[in-house]
Amino acid sequence: MIKLSYLTSYITCPRLCYFRVHVGEKRFTELTAVREIYLSLKQGFDLDWAKKRAKALHGAFDEEAFRSAANKFIFPQIDCKSVEVDATIKSKSLGLLVSVDEIVECDGELLPLFLGLNPPENGVWFKDMVKAGAAALAGNYSKALIYYGYTGDLRPVEVTFSLKKKVIKLIERVKLIQRGFLPERKESRYCNYCSFSEDCKSRAETFASKFL
């Protein structure tokens, strides 16, 4: 199955996606912390439980990342009914597995909700659009919500045919990576703190790499 995190990793860097697919990576970011805080508070628990939960679930738990997230997180005031938290949507035909932070009911319509940290000036980040598109493909939703936990912004994403097509293309590229195709190496700012940097430099490219 192709996880949603593989698609978002590909957007950051195709090679990062390759290593996460074939090697795996244990990491605990502020977004991970925000997710644990959100899920705990939504279910009626407190920050102390969120921290215990995070430590139990994540071997790479980072105290500083959790503290920073807890200090900046704004609990949402959303006029929607919570239906399910920490949900999973599957599409067997596409081989797609989508983890959704929450399913909510707004004006009689079920919508997937994803978490982010800080929003762009307008709209949502492309990664968040991909999350919405993947949820639409796996669960037949027409739109999604993105909640940016550091600002309290709740922003909708309308899922268009064009967005679905972009997500399908990402799925196809990740499928090739799962088969062992190594993407072309591209330098970016992310390389400076990527945990796979040295392995990436030592991997030779092939002709097929240029098409990923």
Swiss-Prot record:
InterPro entries: PDDEXK-like_dom_sf
Domain of life: Archaea
Protein's recorded name: Uncharacterized protein AF_2181
Organism annotation: Archaeoglobus fulgidus (strain ATCC 49558 / DSM 4304 / JCM 9628 / NBRC 100126 / VC-16)
